[in-house]
Curated annotation (Swiss-Prot):
This is Transmembrane protein 18. A motif (Nuclear localization signal) lies at residues 130-138. One of its GO terms (cellular component) is cytoplasm. The chain crosses the membrane at residues 26-46, 53-73, 92-112. The gene is TMEM18. It comes from Bos taurus. It comes from the Eukaryota. Residues 113-139 are annotated as: DNA-binding. One of its GO terms (molecular function) is DNA binding. Transcription repressor. Sequence-specific ssDNA and dsDNA binding protein, with preference for GCT end CTG repeats. Cell migration modulator which enhances the glioma-specific migration ability of neural stem cells (NSC) and neural precursor cells (NPC). It is found in: Cytoplasm; Nucleus membrane. Keywords: Coiled coil, Cytoplasm, DNA-binding, Membrane, Nucleus, Transcription, Transmembrane, Transmembrane helix.
Length: 139
């Protein structure tokens, strides 16, 4: 019986991919653990700018390499999986690999925008304080 993820019968909808995946496979459990660790690093690196930049660059690089990872996984799926999940369109790897990484990257960008807004607000407050101190000297 061919797998539901074979290239000729690959499901078009995202719910079909999610429901037809055997989430108990060790490599998928490991991938889920990897995504949890990435999320934890995203959350705990908010005070360390260089670490967060490095983490962001790693996330973006992994997403960029997803097509190549998909090709290698499609050729060698029997070594680590019970089913052929990797199709030519990259739907499965996009859902289980790239999407969580992109969400982490989005969280980092939101944190950077928030930090930038806080700095801009602080800068404006400091300018207003400086102007307020300069006014009594002029009068």
């Amino acid at each position: 019986m061919p797998s539901a993820f074979s290239v000729s019968r690959f499901p078009v909808s995202i719910p079909a991919v999610i429901t037809q995946t055997d989430w108990t496979e060790p490599w998928l459990v490991g991938l889920a653990g990897f995504h949890v660790l990435c999320l934890l690093l995203t959350c705990f690196s908010s005070q360390r700018y260089r670490l967060q930049v490095g983490h962001f660059l790693c996330l973006v690089t992994l997403v960029y390499c997803a097509e190549y990872i998909n090709e290698v996984a499609a050729m060698n799926w029997r070594l680590f999986s019970k089913h052929q999940y990797f199709d030519s369109r990259g739907m499965f790897i996009s859902l289980v690999f790239s999407a969580p990484l992109l969400l982490n990257a989005l969280v980092i960008v939101v944190l950077w925008v928030r930090k930038t807004l806080v700095v801009m607000t602080d800068l404006r407050s400091l300018r207003e304080q400086r102007r307020a101190r300069a006014r009594p000297k002029e009068e």
